[in-house]
């Protein structure tokens, strides 16, 4: 059963074959990415934004919406928003203001969210997303606007963790009021079969950009970066957009791709059978399917009006230019420079990018490892470990500095490559720094020739037939003795030195 078929079965939905979808329809995407900014305090009050605090301990009258409390704008959040807009090639407007987005839901105790509506801080930008085939897709940005995050609801007694079937709900307002920037794309049209890949590549490129700017930790698993994926289909050859759905709070790069593809197939099946798409929000499930949420509101439903308790924001051109000077080398430019420095092919660089290894390799090189050794570790052994654990390379419990330390131990002759892998496994298991793991596990190479010679003599005595072949000139047979010695020494002997001693003992040195 394919992944799509399994998802359809789990959801109880009909899916149209993907090839038929892209033959009959043109997908139109719109991506809205919410990013929590790494400021010390919240958007409109002095409460801390630290993740993981005890529920409802990082709150005050402002973020709880108590009567008489007034918001005070966080300047650092505004500056982060401007830097993001500049990095996205946006126009930073000379004047913008906040608005109240009115809705009744327990995650926002004021019954409105302070956001920006028709006057955002940044407009009309773009981001070039690298694709797997080495090309790029330019995603146009409609706007980037500031707002406050909502509280977090936990539904109890429900098998799905959602409100349906729950016996109660718990609310944590620690997140309420945390600074957010929402980045909204213009419709992505013409992507065809590559639409899911483009969605994932765009979110990946955006994550890398925000990480380089150091404005957010962009931890999708912790909710500091969340993607809402809008998907609609229109019959091939037509110009009018179809009815869209919005899959909310997709929380991993892979899930963005899966959610878009699933919605294309689900909507394709409905349209192919003569049905109509309902404009609604949808929930993404880790099993790879979406389910209906609520009927999608329009802007009019939120009754936006200017926030009366905050003055408009008018960033001076001097401030904008000063912040422009703080924009670091952007990820795709640094990758191009790194590729030239390392002298690797486009194919090798593309593999490193797709694996999420470029920055990790570069950081390992900065700590003293050669680029060849760093690429080998992150691109092979560590990539395998990450794949086995179902996590990203950057989520492994090992740092570039630690990988560089392992490389140094190999270069110094203290470890062989096979022993180095055992050391890395120890680091991943939390056993300490590489040299500590090497010592604690007794993995250092044996450098004492007398001990190695004793192991060689013992192996030759145990294998007289092989020893006679070597003495007779069949030096290739030495490999069997070398293997026996390496086994006896648990891989801690220097294989090259063992071979030398074997040949010398058999008169072939």
UniProtKB/Swiss-Prot annotation:
One of its GO terms (molecular function) is asparaginyl-tRNA synthase (glutamine-hydrolyzing) activity. The keyword Protein biosynthesis applies. Pfam families: GatB_N (PF02934), GatB_Yqey (PF02637). Coiled coil: none annotated. It comes from the Bacteria. It catalyses: L-glutamyl-tRNA(Gln) + L-glutamine + ATP + H2O = L-glutaminyl-tRNA(Gln) + L-glutamate + ADP + phosphate + H(+); L-aspartyl-tRNA(Asn) + L-glutamine + ATP + H2O = L-asparaginyl-tRNA(Asn) + L-glutamate + ADP + phosphate + 2 H(+). This is Aspartyl/glutamyl-tRNA(Asn/Gln) amidotransferase subunit B.
């Amino acid at each position: 059963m394919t992944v799509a078929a399994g998802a359809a079965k789990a959801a109880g939905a009909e899916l149209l074959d993907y090839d038929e979808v892209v033959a009959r329809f043109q997908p139109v995407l719109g991506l809205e990415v919410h990013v929590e900014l790494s400021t010390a305090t919240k958007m409109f009050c002095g409460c801390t934004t630290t993740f993981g605090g005890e529920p409802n301990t990082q709150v005050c009258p402002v973020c709880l919406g108590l009567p008489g409390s007034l918001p005070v704008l966080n300047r650092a959040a505004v500056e982060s928003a401007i830097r993001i807009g500049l990095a996205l090639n946006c126009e930073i407007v000379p004047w913008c203001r906040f608005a109240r987005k009115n809705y009744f839901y327990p995650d926002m105790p004021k019954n409105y969210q302070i956001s920006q509506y028709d006057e955002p801080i940044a407009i009309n930008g773009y981001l070039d997303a690298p694709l797997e085939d080495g090309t790029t897709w330019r995603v146009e940005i409609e706007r980037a606007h500031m707002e406050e995050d909502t509280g977090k609801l936990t539904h109890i007694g429900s098998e799905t963790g959602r409100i349906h079937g729950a016996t109660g709900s718990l609310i944590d307002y620690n997140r309420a009021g945390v600074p957010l920037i929402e980045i909204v794309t213009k419709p992505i049209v013409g992507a065809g079969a590559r639409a899911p890949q483009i969605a994932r590549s765009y979110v990946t490129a955006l994550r890398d950009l925000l990480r380089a700017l150091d404005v957010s930790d962009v931890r999708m698993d912790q909710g500091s970066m969340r993607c809402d994926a809008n998907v609609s289909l229109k019959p091939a050859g037509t110009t009018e957009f179809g009815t869209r759905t919005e899959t909310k709070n997709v929380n991993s790069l892979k899930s963005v791709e899966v959610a878009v593809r699933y919605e294309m197939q689900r909507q394709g099946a409905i349209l192919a059978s003569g049905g109509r798409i309902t404009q609604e929000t949808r929930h993404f499930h880790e099993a790879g399917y979406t389910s209906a949420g609520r009927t999608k509101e329009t802007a009019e439903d939120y009754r936006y009006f200017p926030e009366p308790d905050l003055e408009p924001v008018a960033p001076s051109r001097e401030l904008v230019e000063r912040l422009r000077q703080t924009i670091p080398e952007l990820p795709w430019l640094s990758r191009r420079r790194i590729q030239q420095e390392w002298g690797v092919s486009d194919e090798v660089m593309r593999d490193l990018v797709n694996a999420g290894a470029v920055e990790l390799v570069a950081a390992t090189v900065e700590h003293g490892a050669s680029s060849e050794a760093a690429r080998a570790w992150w691109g092979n052994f560590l990539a395998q470990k990450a794949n086995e654990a179902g996590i990203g390379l950057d989520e492994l419990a090992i740092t570039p500095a630690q990988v560089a330390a392992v490389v140094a131990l190999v270069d110094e002759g203290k470890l062989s490559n096979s022993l180095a892998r055992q050391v890395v496994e120890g680091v991943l298991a939390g056993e300490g720094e590489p040299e500590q793991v090497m010592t604690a596990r007794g993995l250092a190479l044996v450098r004492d020739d007398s001990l190695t010679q004793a192991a060689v003599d013992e192996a030759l005595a145990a294998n007289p037939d092989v020893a006679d072949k070597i003495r007779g000139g069949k030096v290739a047979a030495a490999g069997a003795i070398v293997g026996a010695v390496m086994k006896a020494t648990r891989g801690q002997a220097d294989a090259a030195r063992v071979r030398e001693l074997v040949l010398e003992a058999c008169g072939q040195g």
